[in-house]
Amino acid sequence: MNKVNILPSDTNMKITLFSELSVGISANSILFFAHLCMFFEENRSKPIDLCIAFLSLTQLMLLVTMGLIAADMFMAQGIWDITTCRSLIYFHRLLRGFNLCAACLLHILWTFTLSPRSSCLTKFKHKSPHHISGAYLFFCVLYMSFSSHLFVLVIATSNLTSDHFMYVTQSCSLLPMSYSRTSTFSLLMVTREVFLISLMALSSGYMVTLLWRHKKQAQHLHSTRLSSKASPQQRATRTILLLMTFFVVFYILGTVIFHSRTKFKDGSIFYCVQIIVSHSYATISPFVFVFSEKRIIKFFRSMCGRIVNT
């Protein structure tokens, strides 16, 4: 593993990576603060606010952890020991899984919230925050149980050079695995992620069906005077579809780039592009929430008004 060739010579790649992380950290901090305050301040707190707060907090920690890992990538020489390597890389892998779990839970909860009263999903509408927290915790524990092998595979290689190790940072690398172990872990990971993404896709498809039915009923009842304004249900459904599209596109791109990287001996550029693409959803999704929810804008306006009046 020649570490001189691992570091990208293009400074623009470094600037792009840290710019994305900075923007994402700022946006998720704002989103987390807004939804946490709205959850505790409003008379009827919505469980979906807690779920979005979970998602933004997970993405915030994911981007911060990635920032620490990226800092070690661009150093001249690695300084981390094996404990730091294993802790940060394992924590980062867990946060990526938690992000998927939180996004999946949000889509499902949104489906319950926007379902009509005649739907069989109505009974799930008014579940307490304890149920939301419990479901999120269950998904997280499930994800943790499949990622413990990283503690064995991650090693500190600040002073070692070998073509058999897979580069992670200047300090850390992954040990090679046998074909059978690689296939087993890959199958478990793909099964887990396909299951969660399928739940997101099913909930999104269900919402599209509901939106289509609602639109047909509205056209039938108000055929002569249709309103050009989108209803809250329509806006929420568009937000769900937009988030789902972003997630799937970035997930597929990240997977393609990862497999392209493994085919090249010096995959430094592919590695950096993979990191940028795989963290794009965590950077972009807060802006989708902020611009699609009028409550957030009203919340910040009222907060600014309080500050001015004090």
From Swiss-Prot:
SUPFAM superfamilies: Family A G protein-coupled receptor-like (SSF81321)
Pfam family, any one: V1R
Biological process per Gene Ontology, one example term: response to pheromone
One GO term describing the cellular component: plasma membrane
Domain of life of the organism encoding this protein: Eukaryota
Topology in membrane: Multi-pass membrane protein
Disulfide-bonded cysteines: C85-C172
Tissue expression: Expressed in 1-4% of neurons of the vomeronasal organ. Only one pheromone receptor gene may be expressed in a particular neuron. Not expressed in the main olfactory epithelium.
UniProt keyword annotations, A-Z: Cell membrane, Disulfide bond, G-protein coupled receptor, Glycoprotein, Membrane, Pheromone response, Receptor, Transducer, Transmembrane, Transmembrane helix
Annotated compartments: Cell membrane
Main function: Putative pheromone receptor implicated in the regulation of social as well as reproductive behavior.
Protein name: Vomeronasal type-1 receptor 101
Biological source species: Rattus norvegicus
High-level lineage: Eukaryota, Metazoa, Chordata, Craniata, Vertebrata
This protein's encoding gene: Vom1r101
